[in-house]
Each structure stands twice: as C-alpha cells, then as structure tokens.
C-alpha cells in the first residue's frame, strides 16, 4: 500500500516538527511556505484611537529588531505581555524615556527561581501540578502573589491587576523592576487617544512621544479553509485544540494552535505524533457529538478561569494537556509501574521537571536513552554554571536524621497519592 501524502501548511516551528513526525511514521510530507524562509509568520493589526493623526513612527512588536533605532527617543510600548515587557526593558537602555502602557496590569514572574535554577525547571513538575489541582484556587493564588510581591510590590510599581495570578498567561521578566525604579520605564494606563505628537492616557495625563511599539498580540485566520473553518473572536472549535469535529474523515489537524503554561515545542511534537497516527488509521477519534460536547465544556471552563481577552482563547495547562495527548498516542508514563519497578526514575518523573523525555519511556517512539536523560537532566542544567574549580564546603547537616526519615516517607506517600489521583 502506497504511503499517504500529507500537506503541511507553514514552515514555522510546528510545521517543521510536523515534517519530522510524518517521516517517522512513514508518511510522505510536502511543506508549503508563503514567505522566503522558514520560521513562521504571524498576522497582526496595528491600531489605536487617533493613530492616523500621529506624526511619529509606529510599528508592531513583530517588526522590532533593535533598540538602536530608538536612541534618544521617547517611546510608548503598548501591552504588558512577554514581548511588550522585554521590548520596554531593552529600549530603556537606549531610548530617552520608555512608557509602558497596560490595559489591566499584570503579574510579573522571574526566570530564575530559588536556588538559581530556571523557574520552569523548578515549578513545572507533576508534584507541583498535583498541589495546584488539590488546593483551592484562592490559596494557590495567595501564596504565589505573596512570593512575587516579596521580590517587588506590584501595587507600588503600578503593575498589580484586579485579577489573580493564575487568571492570566504568565508574564516573565527579571529586569523590569530595576528599570522602573531607575525611572527609565514608567508604567502608564491604557491609551485614550493619540495626537500628532503625544499620547493621552485614560488617567488624563499626556506624554510627548516620538514612537509607538504595539505589543498587542496576534490573530489567526485560515483564508484557505474559509468554507469549513470559521474563526470567531480569535476562537475556533477544535477537539483537543487540534481536530475539526464535523469532518467526515479525520484528514485535517491544527498543530501548535495553543498557548500553554509552559513550552510550546514539546506540545507541538506530541500533537504531531497523535495526528500522524490518526492519519494512518492507527488511532480513531470519538463521535462528532462527543467531540462537540468536550469543545463546549473546555470553552466554558476557560471562560470561568481566565481574564476575558483575545490572549486567553487557546490556553492549555502544560502537564495535563501533554498527558491527554500522550494518552491518545499511548506514551503517557505509567507512574505506578515505574514506582514498583524503577523507584529512582519514578521519583524524578514525579518531583523533577516534566521534560519531553517522559513521553519517550514507553509506547510508539520509545527511546532507549530516555531514562538516562531524565536522571541526568539536573547535572546538565548546572554544569555550565560550574566555571570555577572549587570544592564545596563540608558543612555538617543541621537537619536531624529523624526529620530526613519523615521527609523521605512523606515523599513516598505524596508519590502514591499522585499515582492514585492521576488519570
């Protein structure tokens, strides 16, 4: 039987991943890319009240390349997502003054966690995910907000929003508070209107400006699929954010059309692994009515949880969503089996960072090196930091032995609880 041919629209990060997964499954992929290079192309709009009158320079964050063009300028950056804050911080080293305009404020997390490990390496774990699912939303929000405010008071810095920390997509930046306290970045409310040479903000203040950078996000559309896929308010009804529910045959999948609370690349790969097996007929989708019901349920849960905005229409929780995809492919880690046969690996899978190696331990695409990669990932993270030969001081432990015993027992109990509650 001849191998099936697959058209991949777009040679962005997810498109390249789709190419690789198609080849892994013995399919014949052809990738179509409109631009002259790989890497992706997002759609965006630049607008604002009175912008047509503004005599200065304005652009979208996608077109921003370097702060040198803004040397000595007074610049407004509109939007406090990750792109907006990163650009504002970088511009503040070259521009005369940077104004950061925010509609509702934001909570700012930092890249480096306690002890110097990357934030996601410390907090994106199955154990932390279990705690978040067991504890009340208000409790987890309180503790995380308190931790962030211990670093810098968001209200004092004019950044604190009305919503809670877990009601938004995370904004991450280490340098913003330093740039605000030095006066190089000034936080302002939403822009009411532009004049020829200035921006008037909703609090009535006016600032003379030379340039505007709109970091207001992107929109998506599928003009080549207008007959069967309609985007309404930046939303599209897809089963598991991938499959249209009303096609006669499952021959169409959307890859990477999500905004995860974690890295997007591992999710795109798992989506591709599932989609290719569906295309080959190795996996079936549920009936259309079941898919529509789940789509509606997911949309309702998202509306209850997140701030209403274009930014929060395709949110997914990193580990739960990855596990959903992995279950479909047949590669979700069997925690109980791991705990019984390889407790050392099981503890790292549960309490360590949830890296993509976990989905190469079993099933289709199993990799013999996955176990070793998981057990050595901490060493690989810290190795680049050890650039000065030095022996660690040999301090005697201040923790009594009995406490260590109880802590070890607690770890085992927590693991068993996770295993029993994990779907």
Placement of each model-derived feature along the sequence:
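Flavin (primarily FAD) cofactor-binding/catalytic cores of flavoenzymes
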Residues: 2-118, 123-291, 303-423
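Short, well-structured alpha-helical segments that form the helix of a local strand-helix-strand
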Residues: 291-299
């Amino acid at each position: 039987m001849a191998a099936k041919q697959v058209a991949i629209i777009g040679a962005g990060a997810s498109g390249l991943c789709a190419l690789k997964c198609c080849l892994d499954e013995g399919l014949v992929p052809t990738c179509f890319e409109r631009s002259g290079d790989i890497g992706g192309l997002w759609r965006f709009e630049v607008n604002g009240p009175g912008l047509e009158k503004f005599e200065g320079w304005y652009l979208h964050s996608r077109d921003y390349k370097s702060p040198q063009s803004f040397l000595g300028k007074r610049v407004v950056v509109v939007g406090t997502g990750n792109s907006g804050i990163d650009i504002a911080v970088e511009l503040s080293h070259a521009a005369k003054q940077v104004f950061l305009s925010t509609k509702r404020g934001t909570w700012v997390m930092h890249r480096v966690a306690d002890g110097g490990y990357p934030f996601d390496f410390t907090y994106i774990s199955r154990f932390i995910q279990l705690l978040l699912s067991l504890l009340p939303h208000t409790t987890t929000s309180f503790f995380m907000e308190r931790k962030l405010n211990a670093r810098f008071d968001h209200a004092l810095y004019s950044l604190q929003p009305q919503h809670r920390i877990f009601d938004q997509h995370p904004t991450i930046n280490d340098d913003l508070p330093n740039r605000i306290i030095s006066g190089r970045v000034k936080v302002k409310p939403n822009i009411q209107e532009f004049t020829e040479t200035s921006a008037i903000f909703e609090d009535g203040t006016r600032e003379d400006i030379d340039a505007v950078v709109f970091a207001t996000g992107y929109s998506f559309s599928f003009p080549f699929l207008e007959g069967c896929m309609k985007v309404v308010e930046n939303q599209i009804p897809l089963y598991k954010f991938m499959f249209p529910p009303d096609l006669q045959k499952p021959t169409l999948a959307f890859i990477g059309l999500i905004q995860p609370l974690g890295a997007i690349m591992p999710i795109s790969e798992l989506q591709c692994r599932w989609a290719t097996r569906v295309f080959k007929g190795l996996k079936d989708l549920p009936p259309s009515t079941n898919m529509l019901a789940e789509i509606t349920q997911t949309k309702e849960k998202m509306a209850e949880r997140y701030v209403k905005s274009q930014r929060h229409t395709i949110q997914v929780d990193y580990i739960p969503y990855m596990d959903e995809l992995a279950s479909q492919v047949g590669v979700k880690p069997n925690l109980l089996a791991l705990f019984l046969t390889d407790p050392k690996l099981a503890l790292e899978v549960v309490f360590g960072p949830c890296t993509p190696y976990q989905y190469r331990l079993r099933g289709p695409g199993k990799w013999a090196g996955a176990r070793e990669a998981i057990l050595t990932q901490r060493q690989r993270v810290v190795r680049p930091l050890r650039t000065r030969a030095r022996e660690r001081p040999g301090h005697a432990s201040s923790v009594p032995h009995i406490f260590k015993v109880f802590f070890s027992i607690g770890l085992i109990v927590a693991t068993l609880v996770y295993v029993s509650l994990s779907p």
